[in-house]
């Protein structure tokens, strides 16, 4: 099973289900599984028609429906996606584009000021697609995402399905010494992690995606795992708006790092104790949140017990980008606060001096 197979199966099962929701001018916009995968296929076919088969393609931007459709278009064809941290300084992004040998770039409108710098200092870049419907007054080599989609829609040939050992994505992680390192993950790496995490959700289950989209945890467990279940993924436009967006989208499930959980705890702890917990949960969480998956750092078990008062189960796990990324996790049926759960069925874990290697 490859990522493309998982997504095509999702379209067959959940075609009319709302796959993505986001805020646009204070109104909720949405697209179905059929629409998302149709746009992803247009990107995939467009890249093939433009001669980018086998190339590395960078993406820079915060979470957006255009970003995720482009990412899916890249990894479902014979191309490799290189998602980069949109918060990095321009010179660092130039370095990563060059080090990862990227031939093209998808760029968010917010990063338009970096465009000329990229074109001048990244000699390997052949084309840049802005993640917006139309562009004006742009340099040569720069186009809108719609122009690429139109090329794909008019193309007679689709990209071949990649092989299991083909590199699907390169994730840059913070290096312990010196520069960040690029972790190469294959099609098999991504698909096997999606399948091995035994967490099920009903089609239409609402998930609010709040983690940085260039992280493996967000990409694989929010988006790919969520799509495999027929979930509705809601885009958080800013961490500053997370609590507001929880009340707007009313998620059932969320992925968070411990720092986010601790921030919400402080808000709850500072609330008037006379307010009933059910009322407070409605105000802070939207009233439907029942599960939070967490990883990336240790979480004090106190928070797990505290959130349980509001009917929210926190499931802690452990992983790293090199493992695509989940290694172990607690489940709703087997949740032990203070632990990182059981290893996935396709993972072997070695201990030395009471530490996981």
Language-model features: where?
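Structural core segment of the AMP-binding/adenylate-forming
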Residues: 6, 76-147
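Conserved AMP-binding/adenylate-forming core of the ANL superfamily
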Residues: 20-64, 68, 72, 89-94, ...
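Short beta-strand->loop structural element characteristic of the AMP-binding/adenylate-forming
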Residues: 58-60, 67, 71, 75-106, ...
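Conserved AMP-binding/adenylation subdomain of ANL enzymes
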Residues: 191-206, 213-279
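Conserved pre-ATP/AMP-binding loop-to-beta segment of ANL
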Residues: 15-18, 130, 150-172, 179, ...
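Gly/Ser/Thr-rich phosphate-binding loop
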Residues: 252-255, 264-335
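Conserved AMP-binding A3 loop
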Residues: 30-34, 168-194
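Flexible, low-complexity linker/hinge segments
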Residues: 1, 116, 136-167
């Amino acid at each position: 099973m490859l990522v493309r197979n998982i997504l095509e199966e999702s379209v067959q099962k959940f075609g009319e289900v709302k796959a993505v929701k986001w805020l646009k001018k204070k109104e909720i916009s949405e697209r179905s599984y059929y629409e998302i995968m149709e746009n992803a296929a247009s990107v995939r076919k467009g890249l093939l028609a433009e001669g980018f088969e086998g190339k590395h393609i960078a993406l820079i931007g915060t979470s957006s429906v255009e970003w995720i459709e482009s990412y899916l278009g890249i990894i479902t064809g014979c191309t490799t996606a290189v998602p980069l941290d949109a918060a990095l300084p321009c010179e660092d992004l130039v370095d990563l584009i060059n080090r990862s040998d990227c031939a093209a770039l998808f760029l968010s409108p917010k990063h338009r000021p970096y465009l000329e710098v990229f074109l001048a200092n990244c000699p390997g870049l052949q084309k840049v697609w802005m993640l917006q419907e139309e562009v004006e007054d742009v340099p040569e080599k720069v186009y809108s995402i719609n122009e690429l989609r139109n090329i794909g829609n008019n193309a007679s040939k689709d990209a071949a399905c990649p092989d299991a050992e083909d590199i699907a994505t390169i994730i840059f992680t913070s290096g312990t010494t010196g520069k960040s390192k690029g972790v190469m993950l294959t099609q098999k790496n991504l698909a096997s992690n999606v399948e091995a995490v035994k967490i099920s959700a009903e089609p239409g289950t609402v998930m609010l995606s709040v983690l940085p989209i260039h992280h493996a945890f967000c990409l694989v467990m929010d988006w790919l795992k969520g799509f495999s279940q027929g979930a509705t993924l809601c885009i958080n436009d800013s961490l500053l708006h997370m609590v507001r967006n929880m009340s707007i989208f009313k998620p059932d499930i969320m992925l968070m790092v411990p720092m986010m959980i601790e921030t919400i705890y402080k808000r709850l702890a500072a609330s008037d104790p006379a307010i009933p917990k059910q009322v407070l949960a409605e105000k802070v969480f939207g009233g439907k949140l029942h599960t939070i998956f967490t990883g990336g750092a240790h979480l004090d078990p106190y928070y797990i017990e505290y959130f349980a008062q509001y009917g929210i189960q926190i499931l802690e796990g452990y992983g790293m980008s090199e493992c695509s990324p989940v290694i172990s996790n607690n489940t709703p049926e087997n949740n032990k606060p203070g632990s990182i759960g059981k290893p996935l069925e396709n993972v072997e874990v070695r201990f030395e001096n009471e530490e996981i290697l």
